[in-house]
Structures are given as structure tokens and as C-alpha cells.
């Protein structure tokens, strides 16, 4: 067979966004090419060796529900698993895992190399092939031209990346990897609105030089050990290990303050804005000057290395200051640094220049995903990559894009925030960003999305069969609890008191009993009158059984709140589903303020719902738009890409 040079979809970049994009497109049956500057770094965890967390774990579960690889790879590479917020409500509980970098990367590469319809090729991309307003391919650094009907760009921090350690800096995409300078210049020629952001990473420490006897041990959850994927099993996990905790102190803070005159952040060398929710240690000391100590987590990088990641001291201070501040902390007095911490500054492109499908508004068939859109984090990148891969696949198949709603998925919240509000700093997902978070829980991500994924072609038979059995078991057992009744004659006073604290005085369904505070599904099943289904009829293993029980319990206990939220979603549906004509002339909408006309023309929202979330667009402006649409006015063609396409980011 001749070497193929024409594909349906080309994905540029092999990080968390690029790998999910390539796998999703290929699962849909599209011939897909993944171009990476180095095949050895596919799926590499460039910063912290962990996956998940508050809000982030929700995204990972959604990627998994849609057939993605991140959760499954974490189950195969995870060396510590915890449920965060386990004592709080189900909406904010989140899974977090420490991962062995090597095992995680191996799991991702195995999936890439064994995915039908997917080709891998090691070459950096220097140019995009554009004909008119449509992308038609990519050109590599040695001039190889690949044609594609859609291109997904997932360049991470590589676009014109610059690495800073103290006042020294050099060009790079991350430590040890080259920056994508030519590609960045090419994108600027396309008049896409861009800006500059910054992120950083801490120094790495040799575990042989850490005094663990002085540190607080932080083990993972053991009863039960969590799994990340809905198809995951505890048996997949490698050996589990603890993390360790130390703290900064007054001396540490003095050392950091003494080095600020050589900090690229505080001397104006770095212009990019850093992440608010993952600040550098120098930023923490400056912003929280009254705080006497900060908690630092020492996280193992893997089972076959002595390297530790000190989570909480991301820094770009000079190396001598880094060494001194590390050794000022308890247990690290003799620590040897294996790699210095650094900051990296890179180009991003204003996500308000994207459609909700993640396709650029100015170049048809060109999709962006990951840090190029101004986000931070592996999980945010993977979720965007999955969506961009799906929509690139739908684009080449001539089908309508899938744009998840805010009430449907955290992925919908993420993308809607990006394309309507833009970013002024690296965007991180939190549960607080989702107004419908009680409906968007980790535990029901498959119930929300797997059926959609099946229709899109990204969910295989194995996942679909497992999901169908789980869904049917939850439905069947929930119905049984609602239709099985007990009364003072069938439920003895002793049993009722043991379960509820007092006897019952009239008839209740088992669901009514389960709805009471402190009552569990297992507690109801223990009643002689409960006659619960045998576990083996619900699920074939303990992990799936636990998932089913959790679904049943949450669904019944929170039914009233969930129904109330569903009513709110239904009321807002009219705005979310009302599309704005692509050529709508906002100058013809009577009564709109100058600011509203300017912003609507500039950002070209796709729906009334999107328009309502643009800064400065009032409820009155939305009412005027609705009236205008009902009249069927204002369809004069406009050029949606003309506004906001200068080289500087558009102000909000």
C-alpha cells in the first residue's frame, strides 16, 4: 500500500486533547491522522502526575461516558485513588487519582496504536493548507503535505512557547521539547484573535533525599478503592502508594520574597497572565502575605522512579532560590532537585472566535481544542479534544455538529463559557461554574451521555451493552422500591426503630423510607419486608453493583430537587434552542443599545442562550432580539468574522 497522504481528519498534537480528538474521530469511522513532534510523548503528563479533582473529575467521567480514553488509562496507571468531598452532597463529590506517568502514557499509546482508522506520524506541523476560507490540510517541518477535510489543532503550550527560569529564558514548548514558532506565525496570518498566557511547574525532587519520617502520610481510599472509568475494575490498578504532606514556613516565605527581584513575573519579563487557581508559590506569598504556611503535597511520579512532584510550589524563580526554598521545608532539608521548576509563556487564541462546535468562525473545517483556547488542565483539554474530534468527524460526514448544552454536561458548561465569555486568564473547571450541578454529577455521566455517544458513533458495543444492563437494573429496581409498600403490620416496630429511630404509623413505599435522612439502600434491603433483589440480579461484580446502588439512592433521595431543576431547565430551553440567523444584522434590531449591537456583531452568538451570557447583554436586549426574530426581520448578510480579529485579544 502506498503511504497515505489524504485523510478525513488530521489532528495536530499528541497531548490529552489531541489523543482524545484522534480516537473519537477514528471511532466514528473517519480516516484520521495524528501528527506529533515526538511519538514517545503521546499522552504525556507535562505537569502534575494526577487526573481529576473537583469539577475536573466530572469532565473525565463525561469523556469516559462518550468512549474516551482518559479514565480507562487512569485506572491502568493510577497509583492512588481518592473521592474528594465524600462527606458532602453528590453534586460536588469528585474522583482524583495519582498516576504513574509511564503507565498512563503506555495505556494511551496502546489505545492509539490499536485504534482502527487511525494513523500516527512523527512530524511537527509548520503550516496549514488553506484554500479560500477552508482548511484543506497541514504541512510538516520537512515539507510533507497531508490533505484533510478537517483539521483539529491541539498545540498546548507549544505555540511560540518561551520557558523562564529566573531572568534566563529560551524558546520551548515544554522542558526538552521545541516550540511551534512557525505554526504560531501562520495562525497569526489568518487574523485569528490571539493573546498570551502563562503557566508553570515546580521543581522535581529525588525521593531518596526526602526524610519521610518528618512528613504526614496521605493514603488513598481503601474501602472501597475507587475506579475512574464506568467500565473500570479495581483489579486493573497497579500497586497503590501514599502521598506525603509538608508545609512552607516563615523562612520559606522570606527566601521567596528575597528572590522576587530576579523573578520573571515580578520584573516584567513575563507578560502572559497565569492561572488564578493554580498560582506560583511566589504569587501565593505575594497575594496571601498574612498566611504563615501553605500545605505542600509530595506526589510520587511513578512506581519505578524516585522522582516526586511537590504540588504547591510551582515557580519560575532562579534555580539557587528554588533549591533554598525547597530545603527550608520540613523533611526536605537535604533534598536534591532533579529538574528545576519553570514558567512557560505561550500563545492562545480567543475562544470567542469559535463556534460552540469548537470550529473556528473564520476558517471552515479548522477546530481548536485544549490550551490553545485558553484553558488549563489535562481534563479540560481532553474534554475539548473529544468534542472537537467528534465535530470534525461530523463535519466531514456532512452532519450537524453536536454542541452539548449547559444542562447536559460539564463539557457544555466549559465550551459555553469559553465561546461566550472568553478568557482573561487560564480557565479551570469547578463545580461552581455549573448552575445545574445537581443534575450533572459524576455518578450519572453515563446516564446523561452514553446514549448520545452511541448515536454519534463513539461508543462501542462493549460499553453500550454494559451501560444498557446498568440502566435497566437501575430503572427496574427503582420502580420496585416505589411500588413495594410496608405498613405497621408488615414492618415490625423493632425493625422500623432500628432503621428510622421510631415505628411507622401508616403505609409507606420502600422509596419513601429510603428518602429519609440517614437511611441507605442497603438498610432498606435488610428489612424482611424489603425483599430486595439479589445482588447478582443487579450486577455481575461489586464495582457495577456499587454504581447501581448509588444511582438508585441518589435518584430517590434527591428526586424533589432534581425535578425542580428539570423544571428550570425546561423553562430556559426556549432560549437555549432558539438559533440566531448567521447573517442577522443587529443594526436593524430596534431598541438595541450601541454596546449591545457592537458586542452581538463582534461575537456572533449562535443562540439566544449564548447571547444572554455575553457580558453587557441585558435581559431587555434579549427581549428585543426575541421580538425581532418573531417578526422574521434582519437577515441581511454580514461577515461574522470581521469583528474582533485583530492580533490583540478583544476586551470583555
Curated annotation (Swiss-Prot):
Its cofactor is FAD. Keywords: Cytoplasm, FAD, Flavoprotein, NAD, tRNA processing. FAD binds at residues 13-18. GO terms for molecular function: flavin adenine dinucleotide binding. GO terms for cellular component: cytosol. NAD(+) binds at residues 274-288. Homodimer. Heterotetramer of two MnmE and two MnmG subunits. NAD-binding protein involved in the addition of a carboxymethylaminomethyl (cmnm) group at the wobble position (U34) of certain tRNAs, forming tRNA-cmnm(5)s(2)U34. This is tRNA uridine 5-carboxymethylaminomethyl modification enzyme MnmG. It comes from Paraburkholderia xenovorans (strain LB400). The gene is mnmG.
Amino acid at each position: 500500500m502506498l503511504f497515505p497522504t489524504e485523510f478525513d481528519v488530521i489532528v495536530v498534537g499528541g497531548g490529552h486533547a489531541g489523543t482524545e480528538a484522534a480516537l473519537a474521530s477514528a471511532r466514528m469511522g473517519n480516516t484520521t491522522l495524528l501528527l506529533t513532534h515526538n511519538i514517545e510523548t503521546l499522552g504525556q503528563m507535562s505537569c502534575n502526575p494526577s487526573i481529576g479533582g473537583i469539577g475536573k473529575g466530572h469532565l473525565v467521567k463525561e469523556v469516559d461516558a462518550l468512549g474516551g480514553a482518559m479514565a480507562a488509562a487512569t485506572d491502568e496507571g493510577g497509583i492512588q485513588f481518592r473521592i474528594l468531598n465524600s462527606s458532602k452532597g453528590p453534586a460536588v463529590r469528585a474522583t482524583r487519582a495519582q498516576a504513574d506517568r509511564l503507565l498512563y502514557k503506555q495505556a494511551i499509546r496502546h489505545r492509539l496504536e490499536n485504534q482502527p482508522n487511525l494513523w500516527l506520524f512523527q512530524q511537527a506541523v509548520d503550516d496549514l493548507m488553506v484554500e479560500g476560507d477552508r482548511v484543506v490540510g497541514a504541512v510538516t517541518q520537512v515539507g510533507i503535505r497531508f490533505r484533510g477535510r478537517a483539521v483539529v489543532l491541539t498545540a498546548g503550550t507549544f505555540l511560540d512557547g518561551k520557558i523562564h527560569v529566573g531572568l534566563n529564558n529560551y524558546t520551548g514548548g515544554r522542558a526538552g521539547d521545541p516550540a511551534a514558532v512557525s505554526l504560531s506565525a501562520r495562525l497569526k496570518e489568518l487574523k485569528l484573535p490571539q493573546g498570551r498566557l502563562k503557566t508553570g511547574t515546580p521543581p522535581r525532587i529525588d525521593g531518596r533525599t526526602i526524610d519521610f519520617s518528618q512528613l504526614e502520610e496521605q493514603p488513598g481510599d481503601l474501602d472501597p478503592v475507587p475506579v475512574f472509568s464506568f467500565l473500570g475494575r479495581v483489579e486493573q490498578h497497579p500497586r497503590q502508594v501514599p502521598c506525603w504532606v509538608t508545609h512552607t514556613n516563615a523562612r520559606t516565605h522570606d527566601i521567596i520574597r528575597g528572590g522576587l527581584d530576579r523573578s520573571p513575573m515580578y520584573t516584567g519579563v513575563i507578560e502572559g497572565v497565569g492561572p488564578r487557581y493554580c498560582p506560583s508559590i511566589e504569587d501565593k506569598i505575594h497575594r496571601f502575605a498574612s498566611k504563615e504556611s501553605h500545605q505542600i503535597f509530595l506526589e510520587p511520579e511513578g512506581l519505578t522512579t524516585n522522582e516526586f512532584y511537590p504540588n504547591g510550589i510551582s515557580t519560575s524563580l532562579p534555580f539557587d532560590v528554588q533549591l533554598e526554598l525547597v530545603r527550608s521545608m520540613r523533611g526536605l532539608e537535604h533534598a536534591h532537585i532533579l529538574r528545576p521548576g519553570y514558567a512557560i509563556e505561550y500563545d492562545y487564541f480567543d475562544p470567542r472566535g469559535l463556534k460552540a462546535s469548537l470550529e473556528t468562525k473564520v476558517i471552515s473545517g479548522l477546530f481548536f481544542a485544549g490550551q490553545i483556547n485558553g484553558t488549563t488542565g489535562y481534563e479540560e483539554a481532553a474534554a475539548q479534544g473529544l468534542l472537537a474530534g467528534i465535530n470534525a468527524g461530523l463535519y466531514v460526514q456532512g452532519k450537524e455538529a453536536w454542541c452539548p448544552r449547559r444542562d447536559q454536561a460539564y463539557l457544555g458548561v466549559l465550551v459555553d463559557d469559553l465561546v461566550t465569555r472568553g478568557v482573561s486568564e487560564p480557565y479551570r473547571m469547578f463545580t461552581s461554574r455549573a448552575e445545574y450541578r445537581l443534575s450533572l454529577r459524576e455518578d450519572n455521566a453515563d446516564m446523561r451521555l452514553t446514549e448520545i455517544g452511541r448515536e454519534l458513533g463513539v461508543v462501542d458495543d462493549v460499553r453500550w451493552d454494559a451501560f444498557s444492563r446498568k440502566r435497566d437494573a437501575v430503572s427496574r429496581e427503582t420502580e420496585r422500591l416505589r411500588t413495594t409498600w410496608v405498613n405497621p403490620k408488615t414492618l415490625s416496630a423493632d425493625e422500623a426503630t432500628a432503621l428510622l429511630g421510631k415505628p411507622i404509623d401508616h403505609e409507606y413505599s420502600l422509596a419513601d423510607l429510603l428518602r429519609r435522612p440517614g437511611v441507605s439502600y442497603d438498610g432498606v434491603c435488610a428489612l424482611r419486608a424489603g425483599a430486595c433483589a439479589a445482588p447478582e440480579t443487579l450486577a455481575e461484580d461489586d464495582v457495577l453493583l456499587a454504581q447501581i446502588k448509588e444511582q438508585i439512592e441518589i435518584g430517590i433521595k434527591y428526586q424533589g430537587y432534581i425535578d425542580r431543576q428539570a423544571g428550570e431547565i425546561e423553562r430556559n430551553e426556549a432560549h437555549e434552542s432558539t438559533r440566531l440567523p448567521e447573517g442577522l444584522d443587529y443594526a436593524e434590531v430596534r431598541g438595541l443599545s450601541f454596546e449591545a449591537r457592537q458586542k452581538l456583531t463582534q461575537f456572533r452568538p449562535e443562540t439566544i442562550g449564548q447571547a444572554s451570557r455575553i457580558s453587557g447583554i441585558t435581559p431587555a436586549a434579549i427581549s428585543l432580539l426575541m421580538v425581532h426574530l418573531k417578526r422574521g426581520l434582519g437577515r441581511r448578510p454580514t461577515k461574522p468574522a470581521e469583528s474582533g480579529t485583530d492580533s490583540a485579544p478583544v476586551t470583555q
